[in-house]
Amino acid sequence: MHLLDMRKILTFSLPLVIIFGGIILFAYRGTWGKTDIEFRIHINEQLVLESAFGESPTFAIWLEDPSTGSKKTVFVTRRAAVGDWEGKAEVPVALPQWFEVYKIENETKNLPNFEKPASLAVTGATPKPGYFITRARVDPGGKWICWIEVNLSGDYNEYYQQYNQVTKIEDKYGTGQPALLYRAKFEAVEGAVITPDIFGMCVPDSTDGNLIQPLKSITTATHIFDEISIAIVKPLPKIIDTQR
């Protein structure tokens, strides 16, 4: 190969190498000094099929800083995020605890709606039954409380009926069993795997307050998520960083 040809190859290749190296550095830039919290949830297909409406559950995930009490949403299904309740103006019983988080984050007294929805960055389509995975990026070693709230519409049982013949009370929102709240406290140390525990059931304006402990008359709702885990993992390099 002639020296002139070698120079041409180098002249052409060097900028490509520099560009490629720059892309790699840029992709890793957002991971330096960070760690990811990975949420892995399995939605029980059988319970979804057996529910009155056959729709996947509405749920939200958020993190709380135990030192300040501040909260930030990691993920919320679209129906709750925008208030899309198919003809109903509001369904305050869907995710009562997360709605309070939304109000603080958005400085409002109202529930999410089309005019003022939850942030697009944390909103996602309602996952189909099966595995759902999402991540949040945080500083290593930080202490957190994770909250997960879930409701499967129309998962009626003998205690929570569509229409109670004795009390003559109708479930006007189609809620079924009340939303359940899961909780986990952990430190963001890579390699840790945490399993959240059920913390209570969420019933707005009840005599016991919005959060009721222990569970009352709950049956199948505890199996809507038949697997939940929180893992502290290395961040994935990305050219476009979508982590929250």
Language-model features and meaning:
Residues 27-40:
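Ser/Thr/Pro/Gly-rich low-complexity linker/stalk segments immediately outside membranes or between
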Residues 57-59, 72:
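Short beta-strand/loop motifs in extracellular/secreted proteins, especially
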Residues 60-64:
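Beta-strand signatures of extracellular beta-sandwich domains
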Residues 66-157:
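Structured domain cores in non-transmembrane regions
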Residues 134-244:
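Glycine-rich, aromatic-bearing surface loops/beta-hairpins
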Residues 37-54, 79, 156:
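Short amphipathic, basic-aromatic surface patches that mediate peripheral association
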Residues 9-28:
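Hydrophobic membrane-insertion alpha-helices, especially the h-region
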Residues 1-7:
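Short, Lys/Arg-rich N-terminal segment immediately upstream of the first membrane anchor
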